């Protein structure tokens, strides 16, 4: 396992994920509405439409996760890492880096500090769920300390390792 490449690829993946997500949310916060805390979604005068939900999931799957899975698998294989478990460990480390950069860059710095007013969904202004403590306690920390490390990262790491093995077989 190439540790330097793993860390650098993790930062590259985190940069792509966070910059793309941040730009989309800054452009039009409603596009990210399905990933807002449930209390804010329920309080909205206009809840997310089917088209918005569909766009969000297509964008997350094909605009965010799939390119990162491909990049992670190809880069790891090109770095000389082979075998399912080394590939999965590399993928897990990279996805955890994406996770923690998402927590610190998007949830903590950008949404709660730097550009808070730009992330407010029209019709939910003044909702207590946008407060720092509520956002972190009810949404960001459970997502980034429970959901990502124990569900998302293992699934994405296994998918990335499997993709790496397929690349090794057919490339």
Give the residues covered by each predicted segment.
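Juxtamembrane boundary at the C-terminal end of a transmembrane helix
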Residues: 158-171
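Juxtamembrane non-transmembrane "cap" segments at the membrane-aqueous interface
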Residues: 105-128
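C-terminal halves and exits of single transmembrane alpha-helices
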Residues: 89-107, 132-147
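Membrane-interface helix-boundary motifs at transmembrane edges
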Residues: 46-52, 77-84
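Short membrane-interface loop/juxtamembrane segments of multi-pass integral membrane proteins
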Residues: 39-52, 121-142
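Core segments of transmembrane alpha-helices
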Residues: 56-75, 141-157
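Alpha-helical transmembrane segments
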Residues: 2-21, 85-101
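Cytosolic-side membrane-entry/anchor segment at the start of a transmembrane helix
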Residues: 23-66
């Amino acid at each position: 396992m190439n540790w330097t490449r793993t860390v650098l690829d993790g930062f590259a993946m985190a940069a792509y994920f966070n910059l793309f997500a941040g730009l989309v949310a800054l452009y039009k916060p409603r596009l990210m509405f399905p990933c807002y805390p449930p209390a804010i979604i329920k309080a909205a005068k206009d809840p997310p439409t089917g088209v918005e939900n569909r766009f969000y999931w297509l964008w997350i799957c094909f605009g965010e996760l799939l390119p990162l899975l491909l990049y992670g698998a190809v880069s790891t294989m090109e770095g000389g890492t082979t075998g399912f478990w080394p590939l999965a460990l590399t993928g897990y480390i990279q996805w955890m880096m994406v996770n923690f950069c998402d927590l610190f860059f998007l949830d903590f710095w950008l949404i709660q500090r730097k550009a808070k007013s730009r992330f407010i969904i029209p019709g939910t202004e003044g909702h207590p769920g946008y407060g720092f403590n509520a956002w972190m306690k009810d949404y960001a920390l459970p997502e980034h300390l429970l959901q990502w490390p124990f569900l998302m990262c293992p699934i994405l790491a296994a998918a990335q390792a499997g993709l790496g093995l397929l690349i090794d077989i057919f490339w």
